[in-house]
């Protein structure tokens, strides 16, 4: 507050400011620059594709994308969480990897995008397995809440949840999914004992102000206030379940509050860890 008050005496305008740790402020500065560099690289990649392909005006393509003021140019997809999913996005990036090679662009941004998606899922799986290891000889089961590629749908193609699950199963850990829309419900003996939960789905974040129009959304209140509603928000179906004492909840959306007798881990928030 003292620093803010000091700068207010010398600023001639009323700038927006963010209060954070030294590390957070430095990240804001350098990642701001990186976002610009990435944006320029993507736009100029379209220009290169136009030159190589022979029937494209890059200006027409980029002007159309510039008008996408909700998903591309707006604040959407600026919430760190689960990886990109669905049948379309990963598929198109894989196809564009072939295009980059076929047109001999000389570089492959799409490969970097898909590689980062894989490694990010693997990193999350490792964190879950670390949390699950109670003793050298015993690990808690891992339950991924949300198997479909997004909440409230039955479609599994391109699911980032299943990509995380793939690395958990590959390492030999016990894994279950909880998603009524894909007909996946863990056995009662799993739900009635401590486990590690990944809250992969959060309908409120995925759908935002359109949530009320989504079929299948439970019409009750969904404020995350205790373990019942925390899991209800993640599953999106109104099921009243509790986390058994001794369980661990990893929330990549950082919305779950402190829960009695349950360890809550906000993935991506490491303040105070050092």
Question: Predicted segment positions?
Answer:
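Structural/interface elements that position substrates and couple domains in central-metabolism enzymes
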Residues: 1-274
């Amino acid at each position: 507050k003292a620093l803010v008050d000091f700068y207010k005496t010398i600023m001639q305008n009323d700038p927006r400011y963010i209060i954070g740790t030294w590390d957070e402020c430095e990240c804001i500065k350098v990642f701001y620059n990186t976002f610009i560099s990435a944006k320029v690289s993507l736009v100029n990649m379209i220009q290169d594709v136009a030159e190589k392909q022979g029937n494209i005006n890059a200006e027409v393509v980029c002007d159309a994308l510039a008008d996408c003021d909700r998903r591309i140019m707006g604040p959407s997809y600026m919430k760190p969480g689960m990886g990109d999913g669905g049948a379309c996005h990963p598929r198109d990036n894989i196809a564009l990897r072939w295009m980059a090679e076929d047109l001999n662009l000389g570089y492959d941004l799409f490969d970097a995008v898909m590689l980062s998606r894989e490694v990010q899922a693997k990193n999350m799986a490792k964190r879950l397995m670390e949390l699950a290891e109670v003793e050298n000889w015993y690990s808690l089961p891992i339950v991924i809440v949300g198997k479909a590629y997004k909440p409230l749908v039955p479609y599994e193609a391109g699911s980032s949840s299943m990509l995380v699950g793939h690395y958990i199963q590959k390492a030999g850990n016990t894994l279950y999914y909880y998603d009524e829309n894909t007909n996946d419900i863990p056995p009662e003996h799993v739900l009635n004992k401590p486990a590690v939960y990944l809250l992969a789905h959060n309908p409120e974040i995925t759908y935002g102000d359109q949530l009320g129009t989504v079929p299948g959304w439970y019409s009750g209140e969904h404020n995350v206030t205790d373990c019942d509603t925390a899991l209800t928000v993640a599953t999106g179906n109104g099921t009243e379940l509790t986390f058994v004492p001794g369980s661990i909840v990893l929330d990549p959306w950082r919305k779950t509050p402190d829960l009695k007798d349950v360890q809550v881990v906000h993935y991506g928030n490491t303040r105070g860890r050092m």
